[in-house]
Amino acid sequence: MIAAKKISTAYLEQEIMTLNPVQLLIKAYDAGITACNRRDESKASAVLVELIDSLNFDYVEIANSLFRLYDYCMREIKRGNFDITLKILKELRETWLQVQDNVQTEALQTSSL
């Protein structure tokens, strides 16, 4: 059982190392969604801390907006209100999936020129 766990961990680490920034963000949202579904305050909070730490304040307006949203989610989780955080994380995940799809579509169009 321990060997299988080590293999699984190694595979996950390798997968994460090959993801682009948008894919990493989507993975973080997936982890937050899972934690909220399980009502796991510790993991949900840890995901939100990672999301906050990943903000790029070179883009002040969007970073500040996301910071306020993540901070709000953190407070709601501390109150035991996982449902609103779950909804927000799902919506943000969907948005970033659309961004990823748009970037891939644009890359394909550019490469076919």
Sequence positions of predicted segments:
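Surface/interface-facing alpha-helical segments and adjacent flexible terminal/loop regions used
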Residues: 1-53, 57-113
